């Protein structure tokens, strides 16, 4: 599997940044190529995207989620990928975000694109767009504050600002 790591800082409180990142259905607004993300339940998502000019769909499971700290996922079908997003408060108004993603390019075109740094560049663009989006708004559009461990929701928590 190929690995991408990106770290960036956002001029917003950690709860604002984390809450916005939990709004998976809004990912197409800042991720080029992602056409749709449907949240099926608290821990399952369905993705539809165009990758290297080819339509791809996959299902993903949130395997760990701790408010204001981290979200980890893995694909369960389709395009093979997994990753973690970590949120670290630097002060009351600034947050460091660390994104680690692993994926398996399939076929010649995807492998060639990977070698040329296309995926890394797309991820870089996505984090820059996310940063601009949340910094310009200064508030989240919603948030999911529940916890997930081992792919299962644990304890209280749920949607906010709906």
What are these regions (language model features)?
Residues 1-44, 129, 133-135, 149-162:
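Hydrophobic ligand-binding cavity/cleft-lining segments
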Residues 3-7, 44, 57, 70, ...:
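Intrinsic-disorder/low-complexity, polar/charged segments enriched in Ser/Thr/Lys/Arg/Asp/Glu/Gln
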Residues 1, 53-55, 78-80:
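Glycine-centered tight beta-turn/hairpin loop motif at sheet-sheet or coil-to-beta transitions
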Residues 63-64, 74-132, 136, 141-143, ...:
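Beta-strand/loop substructures that line and gate deep hydrophobic ligand-binding cavities in soluble
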Residues 39-46, 65-73:
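Short, hydrophobic/aromatic-rich segments at coil-to-beta transitions
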Residues 52-59, 105-109:
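Short, cysteine-centered beta-strand-loop-beta hairpins and adjacent loop/turn segments enriched
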């Amino acid at each position: 599997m190929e690995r991408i790591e990106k770290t960036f800082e956002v001029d917003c409180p950690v709860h604002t940044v984390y809450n916005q990142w939990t709004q998976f259905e809004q990912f197409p607004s800042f991720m080029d190529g992602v056409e749709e993300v449907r949240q099926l339940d608290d821990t399952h998502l369905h993705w539809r995207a165009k990758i290297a000019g080819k339509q791809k769909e996959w299902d993903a499971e949130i395997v760990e989620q701790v408010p204001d700290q981290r979200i980890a996922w893995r694909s369960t079908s389709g395009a093979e990928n997994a990753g973690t997003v970590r949120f670290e408060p630097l002060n009351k108004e600034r947050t460091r975000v660390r994104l680690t993603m692993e994926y398996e390019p399939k076929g010649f075109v995807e492998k060639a694109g990977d070698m040329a740094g296309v995926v890394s560049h797309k991820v870089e663009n996505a984090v820059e767009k996310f940063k601009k989006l949340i910094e310009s708004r200064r508030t989240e559009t919603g948030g999911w504050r529940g916890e997930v461990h081992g792919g299962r929701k644990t304890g209280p928590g749920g949607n906010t600002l709906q």
